[in-house]
């Protein structure tokens, strides 16, 4: 499973989560205010798409200008990125799988084998938005696109940027610390996270950032998974 990111990106994400989601202006009075997403739409070749109507001028990815993460945009048409595809959590690399690899090819999908590792390889081979190092987001990263202003049943995403989305459960790369057979997912019907078995079949939304993802064991500024 490919894993990349950057300390600067994580610092941006920390500010993104701790300040705007809760209050309007850190240090000001605690006034509830909906979070405003700032994203740029991208075409398959990575160029900027200046359209806002997905039906007339569809885009393939979005760049979050606050976290510096790029996200894939799911599609309703059949194929590799179809919104209904599901995948089991699978990572055979003992250095990154949290102690248990999960289960290979246990989802229902088209375009690749139906597990997280296979999907990542297929998207990177496609060079989605001109990129070939997409990876499964961490629990922390996936939280940055949860739209807390959207009520159940969701989907709790900024629809202006993710127009074709389902309110399902989406995998993260984060193994549950005390149960290696489990991994964290974000549920986009309720906008909450929970732990499920790696053998289950759920959705995927890959992300990308230019630099290396920090290792909690080696980088002192990054805390290890909290649960």
Where are these regions (language model features)?
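Glycine-aromatic-enriched surface loops/turns that form tight recognition elements
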Residues: 21-135, 139-227
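Bacterial N-terminal signal peptides that target proteins for export
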Residues: 2-14
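Bacterial N-terminal signal peptides
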Residues: 13-22
């Amino acid at each position: 499973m490919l894993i990349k990111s950057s300390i600067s990106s994580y610092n941006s994400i920390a500010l993104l989560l701790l300040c705007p989601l809760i209050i309007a202006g850190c240090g000001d009075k605690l006034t509830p205010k909906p979070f405003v997403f700032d994203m740029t739409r991208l075409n398959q070749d990575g160029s900027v798409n200046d359209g806002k109507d997905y039906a007339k001028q569809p885009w393939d990815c979005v760049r979050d200008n606050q976290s510096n993460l790029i996200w894939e945009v799911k599609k309703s048409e059949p194929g590799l990125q179809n919104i209904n595809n599901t995948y089991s959590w699978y990572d055979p690399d003992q250095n990154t799988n949290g102690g248990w690899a999960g289960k290979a090819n246990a989802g229902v999908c088209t375009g690749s084998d139906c597990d997280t590792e296979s999907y990542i390889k297929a998207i990177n081979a496609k060079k989605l938005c001109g990129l070939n190092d997409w990876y499964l987001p961490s629990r922390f990263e996936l939280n940055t696109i949860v739209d807390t202003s959207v009520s159940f049943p969701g989907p709790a995403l900024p629809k202006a940027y993710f127009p074709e989305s389902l309110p399902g459960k989406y995998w993260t790369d984060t193994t549950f610390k005390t149960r290696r057979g489990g991994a964290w997912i974000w549920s986009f019907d309720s906008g909450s996270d929970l732990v499920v078995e790696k053998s289950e079949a759920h959705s995927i939304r890959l992300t990308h950032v230019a630099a290396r993802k920090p290792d909690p064991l080696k980088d002192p500024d990054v805390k290890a998974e909290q649960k």
